[in-house]
C-alpha cells in the first residue's frame, strides 16, 4: 500500500526505491543499495531495526537526507538493545541537523502526501481534522471510527516511539506555523505519554486562543490503555488527576474512547449556534 501511494504522489517530486532483490517496483526504478541513489530530501525506512542506524548514517552523510520517517519497530519499546539502536539513530539525525518521525510508526499523511504502509487512507481536505497520534495502530482504529461519521482529515501524524518528535512537538509546529485562513481549526490527539506537559499546555492553549478546538485521549487511564501505551513507548501512565488538570487548564476536551473522540470532533465541525434564544 505504501509503495502504491508514494507512486501515486510522485508527480509532486522524484521517488527513489531501494530493494536489493528488484530492479523495478511498480514501474519505478529500484536501486540495489542506498549507496546508489541520488541525493534526496526525505527517507522512509522500513527495514530490520538492527540495520537502521547504519543505513540512516549513509543517507544523512552521503545523500543529504534531512527528514526521516522510520516505520521499523522492535526497538526501545521491546528491549534494552533496541533502545540503544534508537539512540544511535537519534545521534545520526541530530548530527545531520535532520528531523525524525518514529520509529515504530506509520508516518504521516496530508493533502499532498499519502505514503503510509497501511489502510484506510481517509479523504483529505483543508477543512478536515488535524490528527496527531502516539500509536499507528490506534490511529487506524480512530480513523475508521471517524470515517463512519463523515469526518475528513487535513493531516494525520503518527509519532510512534517519539525519539525526537512527540505529540507535543507536532502541536508546537502547528501552533508556530498556524494560518487562520488555510489551516484546520480542529485537532484530535491520542497521547500515550506526556513527556513535556509545559509544551503541551502552552501550544494547546495558544491554538485554542487562535480559534482552534482540541479533543484528546490520554491512554493509560484504564488497564487496557496502560497496555496499549507500553506496547509503543514503554511509558508509565501519567497521574490521571494531573492529566485532568492539564487538559482543563489548556482547554482540551478530554475523551475516553475512540468513539467519544470522533464524536466530539464531529460536533466541532458544526457551526456555532447563534441567536437571541441561544
Task: Specify the residue positions occupied by each region the protein language model found.
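Catalytic-core regions of core metabolic enzymes
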Residues: 3-4, 8-278
Amino acid at each position: 500500500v505504501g509503495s502504491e501511494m508514494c507512486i501515486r504522489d510522485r508527480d509532486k517530486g522524484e521517488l527513489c526505491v531501494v530493494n536489493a532483490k528488484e530492479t523495478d517496483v511498480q514501474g519505478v526504478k529500484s536501486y540495489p543499495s542506498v549507496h546508489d541513489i541520488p541525493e534526496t530530501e526525505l527517507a522512509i525506512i522500513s527495514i530490520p531495526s538492527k540495520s537502521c542506524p547504519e543505513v540512516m548514517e549513509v543517507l544523512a552523510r552521503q545523500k543529504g537526507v534531512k527528514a526521516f520517517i522510520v516505520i521499523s519497530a522492535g526497538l526501545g519499546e521491546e528491549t534494552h538493545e533496541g533502545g540503544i539502536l534508537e539512540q544511535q539513530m537519534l545521534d545520526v539525525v541530530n548530527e545531520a541537523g535532520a528531523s525524525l518521525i518514529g520509529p515504530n510508526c506509520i508516518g504521516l499523511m496530508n493533502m499532498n502526501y499519502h505514503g503510509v504502509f497501511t489502510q484506510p487512507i481517509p479523504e483529505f481536505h483543508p477543512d478536515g481534522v488535524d490528527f496527531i497520534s502516539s500509536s499507528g495502530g490506534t490511529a487506524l482504529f480512530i480513523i475508521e471510527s471517524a470515517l463512519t461519521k463523515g469526518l475528513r482529515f487535513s493531516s494525520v501524524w503518527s509519532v510512534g516511539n517519539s525519539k525526537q518528535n512527540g505529540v507535543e512537538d507536532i502541536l508546537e509546529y502547528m501552533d508556530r506555523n498556524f494560518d487562520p485562513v488555510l489551516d484546520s481549526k480542529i485537532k484530535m490527539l491520542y497521547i500515550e505519554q506526556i513527556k513535556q506537559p509545559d509544551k503541551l499546555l502552552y501550544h494547546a492553549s495558544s491554538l485554542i486562543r487562535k480559534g482552534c478546538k482540541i479533543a484528546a485521549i490520554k491512554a493509560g487511564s484504564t488497564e487496557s490503555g496502560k497496555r496499549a501505551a507500553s506496547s509503543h513507548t514503554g511509558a508509565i501512565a501519567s497521574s490521571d488527576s494531573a492529566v485532568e488538570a492539564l487538559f482543563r487548564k489548556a482547554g482540551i476536551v478530554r475523551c475516553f474512547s475512540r468513539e467519544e473522540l470522533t464524536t466530539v470532533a464531529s460536533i466541532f465541525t458544526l457551526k456555532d449556534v447563534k441567536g437571541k434564544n441561544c
